[in-house]
Regions:
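Terminal recognition/anchoring or ligand-binding modules at protein termini
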Residues: 160
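Hydrophobic residues embedded in beta-strands of well-ordered beta-sheets
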Residues: 75, 148-149
């Protein structure tokens, strides 16, 4: 016989926490409220952060399990309802949603690849690529790519050291 593989349960996660309180708007948008349309408007949408969640809920409409809701301008996933079907991942035009292990504790809640000063100007909780998280991680599970922290969940020991050192609080607990 063939031995069955054990599959890690996955869940969708939105890599952005730039809600209405943490990022500003460059202009008032009054067009079609569909995230797929925003890349065609000036600066890719009204939010100062060009990498952040647009907050118009295209992912909400795509989810057949009612697992995503817009909270204060940013999509949030209900881990209990999410079945990791990937429909939200496929439809997000900013590629902010990914499937991560359901038991992943620390996650980078930012997708900005802008340099630190640009990110700081756009969002109060954006990753600035400072590498303090990399230096703090005892398991060598964190790296910085394109001015952005990335956690290898297979190496992560969930100690919280990266999260504690992050000056922008871009690394959070996945609740």
């Amino acid at each position: 016989g063939v031995e069955a593989e054990t599959m890690t349960p996955m869940v969708a996660f939105v890599h952005c926490q730039g809600d209405c309180d943490k990022t500003s708007q460059d202009y008032k948008y009054s067009g079609v409220e569909d995230c797929r349309m925003l890349p065609f408007v000036p600066n890719g949408g009204p939010k100062s952060c060009n990498s952040g969640c647009l907050g118009y809920g295209t992912c909400v409409k795509a989810c057949p399990f009612d697992a995503i809701h817009i909270v204060n301008g940013v999509a949030k996933v209900d881990k209990q309802k999410c079945k990791a079907c990937g429909k939200c991942v496929a439809i997000c035009p900013k590629h902010l949603i990914s499937l991560i292990p359901a038991d992943a504790r620390e996650v980078v809640a930012c997708s900005s690849t802008d340099k630190g000063p640009v990110t700081m100007k756009a969002c109060t909780t954006g990753c600035i690529g400072c590498s303090l998280c990399v230096k703090a991680c005892p398991a060598d599970a964190v790296r910085v790519e394109n001015f952005h922290a990335v956690i290898d969940h297979e190496k992560c020991v969930a100690c919280g050291a990266c999260m504690e050192k992050c000056p922008k609080k871009a690394i959070i607990i996945n609740e």
